[in-house]
Swiss-Prot record:
Catalyzes the phosphorylation of the position 2 hydroxy group of 4-diphosphocytidyl-2C-methyl-D-erythritol. Belongs to the GHMP kinase family. IspE subfamily. The lineage of its organism: Bacteria, Pseudomonadati, Pseudomonadota, Gammaproteobacteria, Methylococcales. It catalyses: 4-CDP-2-C-methyl-D-erythritol + ATP = 4-CDP-2-C-methyl-D-erythritol 2-phosphate + ADP + H(+). This is 4-diphosphocytidyl-2-C-methyl-D-erythritol kinase. Pfam families: GHMP_kinases_N (PF00288).
Length: 291
């Protein structure tokens, strides 16, 4: 029995979180010939998560159990991540994966990308591959522009398509996240003819001084007015209200858990609202006791 097969038998399972992220700013500074956009953004994790359970075996097959309907395995980022890692490393092992889905889809919280990143990190361990984090980030970029930040695992300033990352230590406030009753297509927003794509870049110092714009906001609200309505409602509870990614989720920033919970309790009569705590270290690596 080779080393990888032995490790699979000794450490057969892991249950790990796949956390949400918030974009604390999102600037579009250009469009590339390949159609991708040059961005500047700041990522921070929150303690609201999907959960995935992985059990390694020698079957060679990747099997996923999920309550999500209508997503073929070939398109599911969890399955694609597992198969990509398996092909890259040339391993014969397989895995059973169970997804407990808590994060909304199409919400700008990065749930699918986070699921893919947790899959890469978990199976790298269970299959005893020993790949470093940068290698996993490079693999993740082949799955989607947001996957690398979840593998990176620390709050960061990001440029390029979001893959050039610099650790950024930030306050860890409390947030109230509102989930409007709509699904925003990222591709639709980035292809919108009215999206401004040539905004001036800023510096980290500009962001820290209060430059928190999201350049997707106007295009999103024009197409999904309920997102603008959610922002107006949140504005009753905080002066700092923002859109994460291309939405649909919006969030407000609060100085204490008590303040955030009071706002959430009030909002929950009419909206789906979640209290979350900011995290500079991903809950994934907190669970693994890594930094």
């Amino acid at each position: 029995m080779d080393r990888r097969e032995s490790s699979v038998m000794k450490s057969p399972s892991l249950r790990l979180p796949a956390p949400a992220k918030l974009n604390l700013t999102l600037r579009i500074t250009g469009r590339r010939p390949d159609g991708y956009h040059d961005l500047q953004t700041v990522f921070q994790f929150v303690d609201v998560c999907d959960w995935l359970e992985f059990r390694a075996d020698a079957s060679g097959e990747i099997r996923l159990q999920t309550s999500l309907a209508g997503v073929p395995a070939e398109r599911n980022l969890i399955v694609r991540a597992a198969r990509l890692l398996k092909e890259y490393a040339g391993v014969a092992a397989g895995a059973d994966i169970v997804l407990e889905k808590n994060l909304p889809m199409g919400g700008g919280l990065g749930g699918g990308s986070s699921n893919a990143a947790t899959t890469l990190v978990a199976l790298n361990r269970l299959w005893d591959l020993g790949l470093d984090r940068q290698t996993l980030m490079n693999l993740g970029l082949r799955l989607g522009a947001d996957v690398p930040i979840f593998v990176f695992g620390e709050g960061a300033w990001a440029e390029g398509v979001g893959e050039r990352l610099q650790v950024l230590e930030l306050p860890e406030p409390w947030y109230v996240i509102v989930v409007p009753p709509c699904h925003v297509s990222t591709a639709e927003i980035f292809n919108a003819p009215d999206l401004t794509r040539d905004n001036d870049p800023i510096t980290i110092a500009d962001f820290l001084a209060g430059s928190h714009q999201n350049h997707c906001l106007d295009a999103v609200v024009r197409r999904y007015p309920v997102v603008g309505e959610a922002m107006c409602v949140l504005g009753r509870y905080s002066r700092d209200v923002r859109l994460t990614g291309t939405g649909a989720c919006v969030y407000s920033v609060h100085g204490s858990e008590e303040e955030a919970k009071a706002a959430c309790d009030d909002l929950s009569r009419d909206w789906v609202a979640i209290v979350a705590s900011g995290r500079n270290l991903s809950p994934l690596y907190e669970a693994l006791n890594e930094r």
